[in-house]
Amino acid sequence: MVEKQTDSVGIVEAKTVRVVEVDNPLKLVSGKTLAPIDVTYETYGTLNSAGDNIVFICHALSGSAHAAGFSSEDDKKPGWWDIMIGPGKAIDTNKYYVICSNFLGSCSGTTGPSSINPQTGKAYNLDFPLITIADMVKVQKLLLDKLGVKQLLSVIGGSMGGMQVLQWAIEYPDFVKSAIVIAATPRLGPQAIAFDAVGRNAILADMESGRPTRKGLATARMIGHITYLSKESMREKFGRELKSAEKYSYDFSAEFAVETYLDYQGQSFVDRFDANCYLYITKAMDYFDLERDYGSLRQAFAKTKSRFLIVSFTSDWLFTPAHSEEMVNALVAQRKPVSYCNILSPYGHDAFLLEPETLGRLLSGFLSTTFAKPKFDKPAAVSSIRGVDRAIRLRVDYELIESLIRPNSRVLDVGCGDGLLLLNLQHDKNIDAEGIEVDQELVLQSVDSGLDIIHRDIERGLEHYPDGSFDYAVLSQTLQTLKNPHLVFAELLRVAEKVIVSFPNFAYWKCRAGLFFAGRAPRTKQLPFRWYDTPNIHFLSLRDFEDFCREIGAKVEVRLPLIGNRQSPVKFAPNIFAEQAIYLTSRK
């Protein structure tokens, strides 16, 4: 019996609609045709009067249209993403109208290998035509056309669902306002294809009368499930523990806990999934390759109009963070709006199903700010602009940086913290803002504010940004923490017309006095750290920075030596009496 839950969509009814009639078959990428095609889907929430609150969910390999809620009063297990979809949840059904459909080729209501072939009156089985991700998305579009949907607020999907999201954004740029791609890849690499091939071979080697039996599918599922887990999660969950005994049995039974776990996953899977569908779906994944289809990844994204959120997980070794960063780099190169976060997680590829708090915050903030522009209230001061920077940053610092930036400019803030400077600039100067930040928590805050933020260490470079991408780049209180400031600064001068830099002055008289009289590493209000916990690794003065600019061929256009919260620059002996400084620089 389903208990009433305030955060559940409750009991939902799956619906099936015909999107392709017998007399008008759909032409597939392979050149084959298919008809008829039925699609099963579920909806949650309420469509608003403007019809602009629709979120479409794309499920992964073994998923279905049943993403949230319960199928009946007696249903004990909610939908596969119930943890994310519902009233007050990340995908809030009090705000959004959510649609999830079973994709083409699956076995949960939509036409696939287990469906009846109208020409034979029997299941298609291996007579079903080969399909691709593009075919699946085309059928999803036919469904939404049938439902009268004019535009999607967002398309969201994890793993194989993320591949569908990419196809959506590329093929229907005017239809998709935003795209959320989670734990996905622009193409399967040879390792992933190899795992799929072994799984298919296990199924095809276990055929009786032309039909696969349960054993092959169970083995394929076990192989696949290994790729969904991380080494850390397997070690933590299983280690080398035995199932029930303390000693080895010295036979071929399942003794280790991890063996029994995989046995359970395999056996439970065959009770709800069709082996032929598994063959077709994994082959469709193998065929997915945006570079092959569009010439290059950059070219694939050339015509997209969506706002993108790309999410990866640190321990995912199936579709690694490098795969996600490759997509981010291509979007950046095409100057498309994109946010990226690499979530710290021990759960491997399955983390998109197991990290509701962090992933939920990302989705909630991104969706909310895509749906409606957030209201910005200017704070009086800033405290902790970086996770490692406990120094109090007074608003005067931001106001002076703002004064150096023209209205309607394109600005990149490197080490942007919680994004407050960019938000101020958006509010006051109507800038086009982008940020880069290494701290995960601050990335979450920035996305929640509606900014386009990339989760990355700036020292890895900006090579994917074209020359002159920005009018201004801002490096605020970060220069002294960089391992290679020369490389970073040179890159900033390449991608931006002007670079604004602020940093603490380590030649400030209190620093000198502390070192001279106390014989200890100096500490001031601007530099509150002890020697062992400071993020600062370079101890530069105003003179040092100006020498540095001359060496690399940078022109100093404006110098603002500052002390405390005074807006007026220090004029007398600034290298001694300035606590910090702001510089506006450019290429000579």
Stretches with model-predicted labels:
Residues 42, 46-117:
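N-terminal cap/lid subdomain of alpha/beta-hydrolase-fold enzymes
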Residues 420, 424-461:
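Class I SAM-dependent methyltransferase SAM/SAH-binding core
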Residues 310-312:
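Short beta-strand/loop motif that positions the catalytic acidic residue
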Residues 175-176, 181-268:
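Alpha/beta-hydrolase-fold enzymes
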Residues 472-483:
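A short SAM/SAH-binding and catalytic strip from SAM-dependent methyltransferases
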Residues 341-379:
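Catalytic active-site module of serine/aspartate enzymes centered on a nucleophile-bearing elbow/loop
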Residues 392-408:
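Conserved alpha-helix/loop element of class I SAM-dependent methyltransferases that forms part
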Residues 487-491, 498-588:
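S-adenosyl-L-methionine-dependent methyltransferase catalytic module, highlighting the catalytic core
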